[in-house]
Amino acid sequence: RSNPSGNSDWQNASGTINIGDDLTITVSGNSADGLNINGATVLNIGKNATINTLYNGELKYSNGDTSDGAHAVRANFHATINIGEGLTAGTLGESSHAVYAAQGRSTTNPTGGSKINIGKGAVLSTAGDGSHTVMMASNNGKIVIEEGAEMTTLGDGSHGVAAYADTSAKGSVANGAVEIGAGSTIATAGGGSHGVFANMTGSVLSLDDNVGITTEGDASHGLLAPVS
């Protein structure tokens, strides 16, 4: 986490963090994110990172716990996260997203949203209810998932890609963008779990060539943009 502990002014945090290849982060505990980057901080991570992974192919952490509200990759305010190719990121608890652009508007930089760039061949998964693999909730934010990604959700109300409208004391959240690279796949298994969902004003969700979307649960649409 890029802000000092107990410092409520984290939207002003700044600096650059550089991490090489083969990073491994494992967290267990409610509201315990793998990465939580704030303010104007830039985080650069190399290839083949592993964050919040599944152990031995089973849907549990090493101690058997799940963690609610614990995201794998999270950027707040106008922070930037860049991760190289081969990322594996998984979450197990409820309301726990794999890639999350969050925290709406900054009072110091209200037009600057958070940015997340994920390299080729990412494997993103969530197991809990209300847990999306890619979640956009940042004013003017942007998420780019490069080609060949695999995105899988198992829980109910868990979308592959979501752009949600939001409001806060700092103002409304709008105009977020998500780009999904060519040859990527999106699969959802739970009820009410859409492949791609958008209700954010001004949001732009772009799917490149040969993106495949599969949904299995009841009331789970491939693409849904509801009327507000």
Question: Where do the protein language model's features map onto the residues?
Answer:
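Surface-exposed loop/turn motifs in large extracellular/passenger domains
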Residues: 1-193, 197-220, 224-228
